[in-house]
Amino acid sequence: MIAFYNKIKNNLNYIIIAAVLIFFTVMSLTGNIGRSDTVLLEKVAIAIILATSLGMVVGFLGELSLGHAGFMCIGAYLGGKISSLLEPTLGNSFATLFIAVIVGGLVAAIFGMIIGLPALRLRGDYLAIVTLAFGEIVRTVVMNLPEGLFGGTLGLKTPRFNNKYLFIVAFVLVLLCLATIQNLLRSKHGRAISSIRDNEIAARSMGIDVTKYKLVVFTISSFFAGIGGVLYSYTQSRVQSASFDYNYSIEILVMVVLGGLGSINGSIIAATLITFLNVKLQTLLTGDLAVLQNLFYAVILILIVIYNNAPALKPFREKYNLKNLVAAKKKDNNDEKEVK
């Protein structure tokens, strides 16, 4: 019984996402869900993929990357271009989407590997600067390529997949992303990755190939960022490089930090909340006030950092820590049983 409970607990995120997918699929097939709702579901799925993939680097590897939007940009433009090229022969079919996802993800992973080889020898602020620069370079290069290739400053016009089923594909890819990341992190390789985060020098002394593991994590993270970009291109009529600036990388980072570093479930929850918040802010902050949206995320990030590091808040953090609250509740229940 305990083993079954632990199995359910360890796979709770799969169960919840699968249940959500089945519920909204039935709602969609019966015509009880509108297009605005499916658009929101698509955005949530993309945000979860981006947050959990960046969480591998920031939360489990312990390295700060600010170029996640750059890898997403690669996937978005390649996915859109491949879809445009295949549309005359395959149409807007699952085959077209499948090919676009594979190619977009693999090319983003290759760029992640190329950038990772020299960059991952750096640490902390230096790595953050390099990845931030990479994201801006990708965005600028794509924007200045000939219009016939990726649309130039006007952006790349993309074909639209069947809107009724895109959110289903998106959540299937979410499950694939979670399965890949969680299986890796629960294996011996995941323990090696965590040891690098905790103490890189000690990990090296134990014979762990630090560079190899860093490169593997960075490459997998880039792969799923590319997939997120491909999905994004299918939700837009035109992909523009301005959508992938450093502000978007910061927004993804806020999801990871808000959910808790090293917590996949936390990243899922935070990505969902931030996406809903985005939709609300876009309706509330219009015109000149739209710039305040990025300021809002900066304030959230600052408050989280202060909360996690301020010595004066340590008693409060320990008192209301979720693990401590659960442990205290279990202790109270055990005490009650002993009294009875």
Question: Which residues are covered by each model-predicted region?
Answer:
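Transmembrane alpha-helices and adjacent helix-loop boundaries
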Residues: 1-340
